[in-house]
Amino acid sequence: AEFAGISIFLFPIVFYVIRCVNLTQQICNNDYMWLKQTDKPLYPEILWSRPENRNGAGRLLIIGGNTHAIAASATAFAAAEVAGAGAVRVILPDHVRKTFGKFLPEAFFAPSTPSGSFGTSALAELLSQADWADAVLLAGDFGRNSETASMIEKFVFKYDGLLCITQDTVEYCYNFAVKLVVRPNTLIVGSFAQIQRLATSSKAPKSLQFNDGLVRNVGA
């Protein structure tokens, strides 16, 4: 579905688009069925336009993690490296430096709350690092903290570049969904339940229903 400048993809589907190969996809509802299975690229023009080496590829900043988990950021970092990103940086809360720093030696660190999540004082560092990047991924594992929630909201609207929001980051966005859906250059990758809640919170004109099928929901 698309609301103003924001694109929203259901989590299982986005991987078909990213991989662009070995596509097996079936979308069904009462009056529509589409089946495509092929070993050819879904969007060959995207593959042909990709840089031939990392020097011509973009720079990605990954933000996420808390004192109990950095899996989302670590997984995103590994996937970006495999996908051929030109340069990748990861920022974690500084509370995890001693615990997880050795697992991500490339990581940068920003100020955290006493409980180990990103604090509001991390905002300046995150915005500074975002100036370096061509795109930012809010990878998730932010934990549950009101100070982190405030920081995320401020970052989303102070940073005006390409932004991808996924995993538990989506849930932080419910409180400012009305503003989020008019933010340009924004991609949200979430579960159906998350996207449904986001659409409701943003006062979307049409509700998303699981039983309606993918095609009708995308049309909404």
Task: Indicate where each model-derived feature is located.
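Substrate-binding N-lobe of the ribokinase-like
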Residues: 46-108
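Glycine-rich phosphate/dinucleotide-binding loop and adjoining beta-alpha-beta core of small-molecule
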Residues: 27, 93-220
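Positively charged, low-complexity intrinsically disordered leader regions
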Residues: 29-54
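Short, low-complexity, charge-dense intrinsically disordered segments
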Residues: 1-25
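Compositionally biased, intrinsically disordered low-complexity regions
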Residues: 6-7, 30, 60
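Compositionally biased, intrinsically disordered low-complexity regions enriched in proline and serine
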Residues: 17, 23-33, 160
